[in-house]
Regions:
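N-terminal targeting leaders characterized by basic, low-complexity, disordered sequences
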Residues: 1-26
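Membrane-interface helix-boundary motifs at transmembrane edges
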Residues: 27, 77-90
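Membrane-embedded alpha-helical segments of integral membrane proteins
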Residues: 32-77
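Helical transmembrane-bundle signal
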Residues: 45-48, 72, 97-104, 262
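Perimembrane helix-loop junctions in membrane proteins
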Residues: 52-55, 79-82, 104-112, 270
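Internal/C-terminal transmembrane anchor helices
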Residues: 84-105
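A structural signal for short, hydrophobic/glycine-enriched beta-strand patches
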Residues: 99-258
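A transmembrane-helix-recognition feature enriched in membrane-embedded lipid enzymes
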Residues: 252-270
């Protein structure tokens, strides 16, 4: 015959089992939710990469996003079999690029101009045939808005011949600005550069031809690109104030991933 002590032990054991079962059920339901989110995110990201291939010039950012997308899908599939320590490591690896992207985004939204500057330097980006890409159009629209507030300034458009282009980036940019109503005589072309560094070096040389005693410039590029380009300008000795242009939301992953690597490369070899 069971004693009162045994009954208490039995009740306690039953309660513990119930708590354990509830906990396991809670974890399992949340595990399914997390896996579903990861799968959805991975496939959505792959679709985004495919779409970006149709509207932009391929960069290492495309490859990075595709690799991360596939990794998310596999992570979701094998989620239950992955040790807790690996889960923690993966979460950290996810947080790092997100935090870095937030930093670049906030930094790129700076507007330090006072609309009395001498020169506007617009950094080149992709050109398809003779048409500017959307990121480049955003940069040029920012330049138009600036010039309308300071029509005494000169605009230097920078960039050589790209992979998908039939004319130089500088020429395509000049045509766009003229189409937007900017007088041709205030537009200066730098059409030899192939990198951001060369953009800035050659643009600086052109600006000094018009302002031999020095000039105050405005640097226009997309928000994600502001940090690295302004640091390069400082390194070269170009006195510019940043003015970030917007970036289409659907191109954030590709552009920010690519820029993250570019910043790391710049920091290592600067």
């Amino acid at each position: 015959m069971p004693t009162s002590k045994n009954k208490k032990k039995s009740n306690k054991s039953t309660k513990n089992k119930n708590k354990k079962n509830k906990k396991e059920g809670f974890i399992q339901s949340h595990s399914l939710f997390i896996r579903a989110i990861l799968l959805f995110g991975g496939f959505l990201s792959l679709i985004n990469v495919g779409f970006m291939y149709t509207v932009a010039n391929p960069t290492i950012g495309f490859t990075l996003q595709a690799m991360i997308s596939i990794a998310l899908i596999f992570y979701a599939i094998f989620f239950k079999n992955i040790p807790k320590k690996i889960h923690v490591l993966i979460v950290i690896l996810m947080i790092i690029p997100l935090a870095f992207s937030l930093f670049l985004g906030f930094y790129g939204n700076r507007n330090d101009v006072d609309y009395t500057e001498d020169v506007v330097i617009v950094l080149g980006a992709g050109v398809n045939g003779t048409l500017v890409s959307r990121p480049l159009a955003h940069r040029l629209n920012a330049a138009v808005d600036y010039w309308n507030s300071n029509p005494d300034s000169l605009i230097i458009v920078t960039g050589g011949l790209g992979n998908r282009a039939t004319i130089t980036e500088a020429e395509a940019m000049s045509r766009f600005l003229i189409w937007r109503g900017i007088p041709e005589e205030v537009i200066l072309l730098e059409d030899l550069s192939t990198t951001t560094y060369e953009n800035l070096v050659f643009a600086n040389e052109i600006a000094l031809e018009h302002f031999p005693d020095g000039f105050q410039g405005v640097l226009i590029t997309n928000d994600f690109h502001i940090y690295r380009s302004t640091r390069m300008a400082q390194q070269i000795g170009v006195d510019v104030r940043p003015l970030g242009a917007t970036t289409d939301w659907y191109s954030w992953p590709v552009n920010y991933l690519r820029e993250m690597l570019a910043v790391l490369n710049f920091k290592i070899f600067e």
